[in-house]
Amino acid sequence: MSHINRTIKPFELNAFRYGAEDFYTVSEKDVMGKWSVFFFYPADFTFVCPTELEDLASNYDHFLKLGVEIYSVSTDSHWTHKAWHEKSDAVGTVRFPMLSDDQFKLSKQFKVLRPN
């Protein structure tokens, strides 16, 4: 799903990023006027998602050279992102921000949330 040239509504999500001193927040202000890829996945500690995250991680430098930031997004907490990053060899390669959409704001905005 493409949201090129669309305005993103205000949001503020907690984030984990390997190498950052602490958790931090990412908002629409951080992505305004910049190329960004939001990669949504269902949940941390699943069997399929690490493969896709590892693939994005292996191409991360290419995206950065093009001026594109990658954000992975799930409804798990930023603490869970950190724990998964520490536990999984594949997810441990991720250097881009892992956003916690635990209130479903961004997932609903991008229309990727599947209600249970």
Feature locations, PLM:
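Chalcogenol-based redox active-site neighborhoods
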Residues: 1-116
